[in-house]
Structures are given as C-alpha cells and as structure tokens.
Amino acid sequence: PDTPAVAHQTIEAAIAKAKKLYPELPLFAAGKSFGGRMTSQCMALHPDATIKGIIFYGFPLHGPGKPSVERAEHLKEVKTPMLFLQGTRDELAAWNLIEPLCTSLKLATLVKIDGANHAFKAGKQNILQLLADSTNEWVMKKIKKG
C-alpha cells in the first residue's frame, strides 16, 4: 500500500471529483481494510468534509497476532456516521476488541458477519450479497435521515 499521506491525497481527490461530477447526490466513502482506515484518518483530519458516511469492509484494527486498538485512536475524531462490516474470525480485528470499540463510538454501526475472516471467507455463505445488502440498508437509512 501507499504511505498514509499518499492515500489521504488520493481519497481527497476522489471525494472532490465525485462532488464535482455529482453535486446533487449524497456521497459516502468506503474502503476495504487499509483503504477504509485511510479514509477514516483523512476524515478525522478534515471533519468539515461533506460525506454522509464511511463504510469499512474489514477495518484493520491491528496486525495479525498483535491485538491492539491503537490504529483506531483517530476514530473518535471522525464526525460522520461509520458502518463497520466485520467478520468474527478477522485476523486483523479480534472480535473482543472491535465490538467494544464500535460500541464506544456514538456514530458507529457494527454488522457482525459470523465466521468470516478478513477476506470475508466463511464457508459457503454468500458474504458478498450480505455485504451489499447491509451497506444498502445502512446507506438508505442515512439518506432518509438527511
């Protein structure tokens, strides 16, 4: 992956381009793993950003086998709603750490994906459809709220 500075610049450019192309539409930012974490870091640095929410597909809370919540310290600075889609077997986000973290963030919603790892592998379940449906439901609620 890129450095955080490069990732932040890329995210800012993507948001600016989307706002320019579709100024009338509500804008949500999403990322898988590092992309989601960099998006939330960027939004913590720019709380005035006009996105309606951030969607995390497997937030990388810590390195494999190194349980910690340090990577999430910036989340309390994020001023927009956040959706965390997390597997219970995610090797980069121990469930016993990610669940209380999300509970502590008043703007966070956590969707538990039983048996899924960081790549959202969970046997024969159709996880992609679950991710899409959960995202759609959350986004529609946020749009209706205004």
Language model feature labels by segment:
Residues P1, A116-L130:
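Catalytic histidine-centered segment of alpha/beta-hydrolase-like enzymes
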Residues P1-F28, Q41:
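Serine-hydrolase catalytic machinery in alpha/beta-hydrolase-like enzymes
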Residues F28-G31, Y57:
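Short beta-strand immediately N-terminal to the catalytic nucleophile in serine-hydrolase-like folds
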Residues G31-T39:
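Gly/Ala-rich beta-loop-alpha elbow adjacent to hydrolase catalytic centers
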Residues A49-L61:
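A conserved short beta-strand
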Residues V78-K79, F84-Q86, D90:
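Short beta-strand/loop motif that positions the catalytic acidic residue
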Residues E91-L97:
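Conserved alpha/beta-hydrolase "acid-adjacent" motif
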